[in-house]
Amino acid sequence: MGGNQILKQIIAKHLLDIQAVFLRPNEPFTWASGILSPIYCDNRLTLSFPEVRNDVASGISKLVKEHFPEAEMIAGTATAGIPHAALAADHLNLPMCYVRSKPKAHGKGNQIEGAVQEGQKTVVIEDLISTGGSVLEACAALQAAGCEVLGVVSIFTYGLPKAEEAFAKAELPYYSLTDYDTLTEVALENGNIHSDDLKKLQTWKRNPESKDWFKK
């Protein structure tokens, strides 16, 4: 088993153990978009557990060094990506900035906070990737400011087809500490879910906008 797969399993177990991720295949959550989802993820909880927080920061730093060794700046997405970007930037001894979802309505009207420079090679840190829309908007804001965005690193990704398409269209790579497939496998091994639940979870991922998975 490769090092990255071991890391994926460690982070997945952390997220389950601290209940940053809930799996409810029989009592789905409703997302703001109206999608019925068997999973709810709140990676902000990782900040409250020092061991988990350190493993996340170390893991993000490892992925940045491995995939983006030329990085000159770490950018966090507001608000959930900011603390993880700060911790990773500290590990890597790199400058850090953060990107709001839209410019401030007062003051200087900044969307990007921090000292960014033209051509600065930047990696964007996000806590969670679902469709990829919000983090790609942050990438676009950085590009508009003159940064060279190398790619994105996140704690967790659902691995949804819509996200894969969005990143391919933006011509940006992304890497995650762990993912939906790894997490559901770890959940099954740990007894968090049963084999019938796993089938439902796999069906949802293939087409999250359909409610057919819930009827199975």
UniProtKB/Swiss-Prot annotation:
Binding site for 5-phospho-alpha-D-ribose 1-diphosphate: R100, K104, H106, E126, D127, L128, I129, S130, T131, G132, G133, S134
InterPro entries in the cross-refs: OPRT, Or_phspho_trans_dom, PRibTrfase_dom, PRTase-like
Highest taxon of the lineage: Bacteria
Reported cofactor(s): Mg(2+)
Chain sites annotated for binding orotate: S130
Function summary: Catalyzes the transfer of a ribosyl phosphate group from 5-phosphoribose 1-diphosphate to orotate, leading to the formation of orotidine monophosphate (OMP).
Subunit structure: Homodimer. Interacts with BrxC.
The keyword Transmembrane helix belongs to this UniProt entry's keyword annotation: no
Natural source organism: Bacillus subtilis (strain 168)
UniProt xrefs under NCBIfam families: pyrE
Signal peptide per UniProt: none
Annotated gene: pyrE
Catalytic activity: orotidine 5'-phosphate + diphosphate = orotate + 5-phospho-alpha-D-ribose 1-diphosphate
GO terms, biological process: 'de novo' UMP biosynthetic process; pyrimidine nucleobase biosynthetic process; UMP biosynthetic process
EC number assigned by the record: 2.4.2.10
Enzyme class, spelled out: transferase
GO molecular function per UniProt: magnesium ion binding; orotate phosphoribosyltransferase activity
Lineage: Bacteria, Bacillati, Bacillota, Bacilli, Bacillales
Pathway: Pyrimidine metabolism; UMP biosynthesis via de novo pathway; UMP from orotate: step 1/2
Protein name stated in the entry: Orotate phosphoribosyltransferase
Pfam (any one): Pribosyltran
Keywords: Glycosyltransferase, Magnesium, Pyrimidine biosynthesis, Transferase
Family of this protein: Belongs to the purine/pyrimidine phosphoribosyltransferase family. PyrE subfamily.
